[in-house]
Amino acid sequence: MRNYLVIPLLIGYCASVEALTLEQSVAQAMINNPKLLQKYARFEARYKDKRAAFSDYLPQVSLYAATGYERIVHNNGRDFDSELNRRELGLRVTQSLFSGFQTVEEVARLDYEIKADRQALVSAAENLSLEIAQVYIELFKSKGVLELSEKNISDHEEILEDIKSRAQKGLSSDADVAQVQSRLATAHSSLLAAKNNHFDLRAQYYDLVGVYPNDLHIPRADTNYLPESLAIAIERAKANHPEIKASIFDVKAAEKQIDREESDFWPKVDLQLDINSNDNIGGFEGPDDDGRIMLTMSYDLYSGGKTVAKTEAAAWRKEEAKAIRDDTYRQVVEGTTLAWNAYRFVTEQKDFYRQNVDYASQAQIGYMKQFVIGRRSLLDVLDSKIELFVARKNYLNASFEEQKASYRLINATGKLIEELRVDTPEAWQLKEQDTEESTKQEVNK
């Protein structure tokens, strides 16, 4: 007779009015999780930075006004005019015609920064989804441990009543009663530890999702997203992982930063329109109006080596970005390998724990029968109870660890949100339209 007593114990867990699936938990967290909102705020701010850079393509219009007392003295020391209230009013319109490609490169750099920040946002959402999935599954496991612990107490209480009855008949000693009571106290302690863990998990869930868990449903990972081998898993991770994509865009942004700094080696050409309407200027009473349109050029011949130093600094930042990209590749490969190993071995391990439950259950039943006829000691019976309790806990743990390993492996390949069928917020989708078409092409360059 098999006595797994694991998954069936969880059937009564769903008893609240509203159901909250894993997918719904992730979707809700994407809207209100503070850590994710931080990433989103940075993503939005980058768009504003790009808009600010783009403004250099447009005319710059400024209005100037001034008024005050003017006194002019000739070289001979005589006052030219006694009192005049000088008034100035001017309008200047400047259109940049050539900035050494500074605006072009800055806009291009920020476009890559936007793409990098979006991938960082997706990566944060992927990792948050994994955290929620793990806590979600741990809640089920903790509920199972609670029920196992309660049954363990019930079993020991039955044994205690039986031993007390036997002691009254002279078939067992007071030491036997004390021994069972000691084991019962340990069982109560284990139950309290299980309750503590369960409520800690509820707090963790609240931290991630923003609400306390109510009615949960056992999740099942879509096996279509589970790779068949480690090689396939690594290949998917390299192609899809948002951290890798973000690091690639960071390198491209660093390249554009170099080009932007080099723009200071070029002259700047502007078209400038000035219109002035003044009064009492230069000691002459009355209006003094003028207007002009000029083509201006400025060329920085020497800046103390600043331009060269800034260009070299940008080149080193590119090297830093490349090193981060290479390290990201290694971390993704390592994470995928660890996730694959966990998934593979916990699946095999679960089969042995199942056998452990079978044999421990058979041994416990046999020991109890032998104890009744005096062929086994009370200690043997109690030890067999503990062994069965531990075997059931191990099988319970392995069953849920297998589920956690499945989600971890899918996350390692960068496809967890897709597997959960969770749509990212609409604001992400709108920004995505601006940059996603070229994302794959840029990553593959």
Model region roles, listed by residue range:
Residues 37, 60-84, 94-123, 245, ...:
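Small/polar (Gly/Ser/Thr/Ala-rich) solvent-exposed segments
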Residues 1-4:
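Positively charged n-region of N-terminal signal peptides that target proteins for export
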Residues 38-53, 124, 128-148, 165, ...:
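Amphipathic alpha-helical coiled-coil segments
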Residues 86-88, 134, 179, 290-292:
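Transmembrane beta-barrel architecture of outer-membrane proteins
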Residues 20, 125-238, 250, 339-342, ...:
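Periplasmic alpha-helical coiled-coil/stalk elements that build and connect Gram-negative outer-membrane
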Residues 12-16:
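N-terminal signal peptide c-region/cleavage motif recognized by signal peptidases
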Residues 90-92, 136, 270, 294-296, ...:
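Membrane-embedded beta-strand positions in outer-membrane beta-barrel channels/transporters
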Residues 394-445:
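Acidic, low-complexity, intrinsically disordered peripheral segments
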